[in-house]
Every structure is written in C-alpha cells, then in structure tokens.
Amino acid sequence: MKRNPTLTERFRILLLPLFLGLLLGFGVLLAQDAALQLTEKVIVSAEKKYGPGARVRLLAWTKMIADNRKKPEAEKLKLANDFFNQIPWVSDIENWGVEDYWATPVEMLASNGGDCEDYAIGKYFTLLALGFPMDRLRINYVLAPAQDPVNQAHMVLTYYPKPDAVPFVLDNLVKEIKPASARPDLVPVYSFNGEGLWMAKERASGRASNSSSKISLWAQLNERMGKEL
C-alpha cells in the first residue's frame, strides 16, 4: 500500500522549487542599492487602483526607511516588524483571486492586505534597505500547528546578530520579536535569502543547498518589483 506523503514531504515536493527561485533577483538589487525610492508614476498608479490610502502607506514606508538607516539594529528590527504587522491579514484568494500569490511590498502596502509570506518578504526587503547584511537575514518556512492546526504552513523572518547566534523571529502572528529559542511553537522546514537556500538540518553547518532552478511565481514577482523601483 502506497504511503501518503507527510506534511513536511509535501513542503519539499511543492515548495522547494519556489524557494530556489528566490535565490535570484530582487534581493541582490536591494542589497546593492539600498536607497529605496518609488517613482511618482508607481505611487499614482497605486493611488488610482486602491485609493488615497495607498499613497499615504507607500510614502510612510519610504520615509521610515530614509529616516532610520542610522538607528541601532534593534530599533530598526522593531520598526520594520511593527510597520508591516499593522497591515491587515487578507488571504490571497480575497486579495488577488488566486490561491497563492507573493505580493511585492508595494502591492501589499497599496492594497492594505497580505498573508504570512507577504509580511515576511516585506520585512526582509525593508531591512535590506535599512542596511542589514543579507547574510544575517533568512525568510523561513515553518510549521505552526499551535497557531493553525489545519493549515500548518507559515512564514516568518529571522535575523542572526552573528552567524552562529540564535536568531530573532519577526512574525505577524506573535508580534513581539523573540529569539527562536522562545518560539517552540514553530518547526523550521526551510530558510532562504538572496544568497542561498537551507534545509533546517543544514542551517547549523552553514551549508547552502545547490540549485539554479527558477519558477514563474518568483520570476513574475521579480518582474513586477523591477517596474516599481
């Protein structure tokens, strides 16, 4: 009798190509040009589609980044975490009409809604723009059965003060920034940034998984972000 794949195995089968696609593109762009600026054309377009609140949110985002690049790291972490956590949670079906859509930070802020991956991605790019080294940031797919027993998949951002340190978790569900050691409710599966992809068991060794795969979801996101900046 054929065994049904476990949830973790389904993560590996369905999401691994997506993670690998994230190793390319916009993360490198932001790391090289951290002075984030949005054109008036992008802001006007968002305002026409989503109303005047879109302009307010986008300008608040760029101002927050511009005003705080020289602040201490702990303060910048809290600023980015709090800024995106104030955006309402909205499912991809409700917001975009599809089951899985990775919104750009501009799209999330303009539409005033997003789900777990949008929070993590928005914080990641914001911290890059605030001057954080890419190698200290990881976007993490985790299982969070205590938060949602039915759909356990969740995404958070982690920050490593030092390469071998216990990371801090930036989450939209538990909004206080805590060390990962204080978040036993999260079961790590994968982590990635613009430089590599790590399975949970590989993180301690510092070894990145190797692949050059790309998929359309990230390619489309990268294309949209290129038009926004």
List each model region and its residues.
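N-terminal secretory signal peptides that target proteins for export/translocation
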Residues: 1-9
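A structural boundary/capping signal
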Residues: 26-229
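Bacterial N-terminal signal peptides
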Residues: 14-25
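Hydrophobic alpha-helical segments, especially transmembrane helices
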Residues: 11-13, 124
